[in-house]
Amino acid sequence: MKHRVLYIYEGKLSYHGIDRVVREQLLALTGGGCLVDLASRGDPGIDGVSFLGRKWTIANLISWLPRSVYYPAQKRVFMRLGARLADKHNYTKIISWRDRALLPFRVASRKGIPCYLSHDSMHWRGTMAETNPLPWPSLSTSEMDEEYRLAKQILLPSENSKDSFLRNGLPEEKLKVIGRGVDTLLFAPATSRTDSKFRIAFCGRVCERKGIRQVLEAWKIASIPNSELLVLGNVDKSLGDFVDANASGNIRWLGFQKDILPFLQECDAQILLSRREGMAKSLLEGASCGLATITTKDSGFPMQDQINGFLVERESTAHIAELMQRLDKNRALCSEIGAAGRNTVLENYSWGAFQKRFLAAVAG
């Protein structure tokens, strides 16, 4: 008899970001012989997955409101749908992403169904949820704690994320690091370059948390001739004036790009100076392309300093500038570090490897 699994996630199941992670988890489940009931806004079209979600919900009526209201409202809708499905059917297990799991996990606890919480970030303590908690419809911190408590396993993107849970008292046996994945055949080094200009990519939301101010400060200090900094990602509204003030020179503000591969393949290195990041998937994609990586511990990148990348403190802009200059002047070193980063991805972070880790984590 095949296992029947309820999977809850309110996204549209595109091929980007967390949507892609969800797709890979669904493929892993069906490939492992499970039948999946999916509560989401998108039908992935995967054999063995029954779409029981809604492409339009009542929360769409408030889609004009700020993200901080609209997205939690959608999560509440699918949390309630998940609870109804959990109450109606006898599932072998329930898998839900954080902030969508509370009500279905309560039902599952009553029925004795094991629950698995997929988490994309850090424990809520030390994040905006603690320092500036959002009102309803966001979950309260006590509700987040209840999700943690009801989960049999919490599936985490990095060791850094796991450490944040351990520091806050969660037992190690509840925490499973499954990492992330990347299409290593697609994200591969370029066979040739159009020119020899030294380029660094910043790929991610352009916001304070990702360290864009520090990146630009280091870039200006480095002042590398014949070079470009490519900034790929949506800009936070609060940084509009900052971007306008830095819109000239050798900084290219490219906005959000559905296809980042052509830009990565024109670069030599990548940089992200994140705080409180679960796992920066864009860094895995850049590393898979053979880019030398400069990042912080908080990015979640599997770093061996000066072997497969460079680990830095985000405020050490003078040191970061020196690294940029060093990689420009020593292209052989840049290529060597980039190749080591790609090997790390090939060995541990293909989507196939990710699927195996995920299946092992939810096997109990």
Each model region followed by its residue ranges:
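Acceptor-binding helix/loop patch of EC 2.4 sugar-transfer enzymes
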Residues: I58-V69, C115-D145
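Conserved acidic donor-binding segment of nucleotide-sugar-dependent glycosyltransferases
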Residues: K297, M303-Q306, F310-T317, R326-R331
